């Protein structure tokens, strides 16, 4: 299994252009929610995660996906994926608090893990 990093980078760029950057410094209060006390999420997180999940499933069919917002909702964590299976790890907007405040310190983070190795 060889994944071209440029294909992953393209998916990340497209997601940033469509779901994240158009909302930067433009979020309304109703687009920022608290998923747990002190832990916020935005519509950009949800939309970006949905797009990234679909694109990465297409790129590597059969791989598991552990995405931050779905994992938070479903009560999953990395320990649930400690196996030889291939798993995409997704943080659709790493630095959500900064993003929600209009501070330019955030990123889309993706890792591919197989047998505990990235």
Please provide the spans of the model-predicted regions.
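N-terminal subdomain of lithium-sensitive/metallo-dependent phosphomonoesterases centered on the IMPase/IPPase/PAP
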Residues: 1-90
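DPxDG-like acidic metal-binding loop motif
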Residues: 80-118
């Amino acid at each position: 299994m060889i994944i071209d990093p440029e294909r992953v980078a393209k998916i990340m760029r497209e997601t940033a252009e469509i779901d994240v950057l158009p909302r930067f410094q433009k979020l309304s209060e109703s687009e920022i929610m608290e998923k747990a006390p002190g832990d916020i999420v935005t519509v950009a997180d949800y939309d970006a995660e949905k797009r990234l999940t679909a694109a990465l499933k297409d790129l590597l069919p059969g791989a598991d996906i552990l995405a931050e917002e779905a994992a938070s909702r479903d009560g999953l964590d990395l320990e649930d994926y400690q196996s030889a299976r291939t798993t995409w790890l997704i943080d659709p907007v790493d630095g959500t608090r900064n993003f929600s405040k209009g501070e330019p310190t955030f990123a889309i983070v993706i890792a591919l893990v197989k047998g505990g190795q990235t």
